[in-house]
A protein has these predicted regions:
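Short, Lys/Arg-enriched N-terminal segments with co-localized hydrophobic residues
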Residues: 1-9
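Active-site neighborhood of HAD-like aspartate-dependent phosphohydrolases
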Residues: 10-58
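Substrate-recognition element of Asp-dependent hydrolases with the DxDx(T/V) motif
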Residues: 43, 47-80, 94-106, 145
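Short, electropositive alpha-helical surface patch
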Residues: 69-84, 109-121
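Structural recognition of alpha->loop->beta junctions
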Residues: 80-99, 164-184
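Conserved Lys-Pro-Asp/Glu-containing loop-to-beta segment of HAD-superfamily phosphomonoesterases
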Residues: 109-142
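Acidic, Mg2+-coordinating phosphoryl-transfer loop and its flanking beta/alpha structural elements
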Residues: 134-172
Length: 184
């Protein structure tokens, strides 16, 4: 039994990662193509560490650029292909990529902070919340994790800054994905 961030894990099996700002550089203008997708320093190696530790690693990402018409589905697939190839170069693979294509105005069930993506992930592998941790760079990631009963870690490599939201006193905020993996 492991305790972390106020949550107790029976057995941690699954790490859910946001994409933009956690795995790759984010942009206020959105990441719209594979050419714009650049891994953050150490992020892919951190994913490899998780995989070598025997953990399932899944991406859960809001991609409202699709709903806004900023890029097409094929461009998103090309970004994900680039990401998975670079991770594959380290001898490991992601277990899944889940994304929401909707804008906030769509009021869908899948866009974080709603729990739809996390519910889908837990359903796919028959997981309980105590088996998962979410690592994200945005308050919406933390809100979704809390609503789903999942422990979370925030990273400053994206939207979080040194004056983090104080609503989550039980949520560690660290510099980047590598530092988050060190906490697990």
């Amino acid at each position: 039994l492991v305790s972390f961030g106020g949550k107790r894990f029976m057995t941690l099996t699954t790490v859910v990662l946001d994409r933009d700002g956690v795995i790759n550089r984010d942009s206020p203008a959105f990441i719209k193509s594979a050419a714009e997708w650049h891994a953050l320093p150490g992020a892919l190696e951190a994913i490899a560490r998780l995989k070598h530790a025997g953990l399932r690693v899944v991406v859960a990402s809001n991609q409202s650029g699709l709903g806004r018409g900023l890029f097409e589905y094929d461009a998103l697939l090309a970004m994900h292909d680039k990401m998975t190839r670079q991770i594959g170069d380290l001898g490991v693979a992601l277990d899944g990529i889940f994304f929401c294509p909707h804008t906030a105005e769509a009021n869908c069930a899948c866009r974080k902070p709603a729990t739809g993506l996390l519910d889908d992930i837990m359903g796919r592998w028959h997981l309980g919340p105590a088996e998962c941790v979410m690592i994200g760079d945005s308050p919406t990631d933390i809100e979704a994790a809390h609503a789903a009963g999942i422990a979370s870690i925030g990273v400053r490599s994206g939207k979080f800054i040194d004056t983090e939201d104080k609503r989550w006193t039980d949520v560690p905020i660290v510099d980047d994905l590598s530092a988050a993996v060190d906490r697990l």
